[in-house]
Amino acid sequence: MTMKKLLIIILPVLLSGCSAFNQLVERMQTDTLEYQCDEKPLTVKLNNPRQEVSFVYDNQLLHLKQGISASGARYTDGIYVFWSKGDEATVYKRDRIVLNNCQLQNPQR
């Protein structure tokens, strides 16, 4: 078998392995943060490689990308904003607070 044919056979296998490895690494770099807000608990998935957070609010799964913030970490999709600083967070919908006084539960120090 020529080297070219061997490469054609092996290359897709190697590339699929890289994709699976990258997905595994990305899952390992995702943190689950548990907050207790005024009204209810909030579970937030923080995906550092993608610079986004995701959570369920009002029966919708939201994915918010990291935005510009003078202080703390701010994530938005244009409608919702998740803003955290230290162990506290707030969720806004169209500039109105919908989840307030969210306290991180069991923070890792």
Swiss-Prot record:
GO terms for molecular function: lysozyme inhibitor activity. The record marks 71, 85 as: Directly involved in lysozyme active site inhibition. Keywords: Cell outer membrane, Disulfide bond, Lipoprotein, Membrane, Palmitate, Signal. It is found in: Cell outer membrane. The keyword Signal applies. It is a lipid-anchor. A lipid is attached at residue 18 (S-diacylglycerol cysteine). One of its GO terms (cellular component) is cell outer membrane. Residues 1-17 form the signal peptide. It comes from the Bacteria. InterPro entries: MliC, MliC_sf. A lipid is attached at residue 18 (N-palmitoyl cysteine). Disulfide bonds join 37-102. SUPFAM superfamilies: YdhA-like. Monomer. Belongs to the MliC family. Type 1 subfamily. Specifically inhibits C-type lysozymes. This is Membrane-bound lysozyme inhibitor of C-type lysozyme. It comes from Escherichia coli (strain K12).
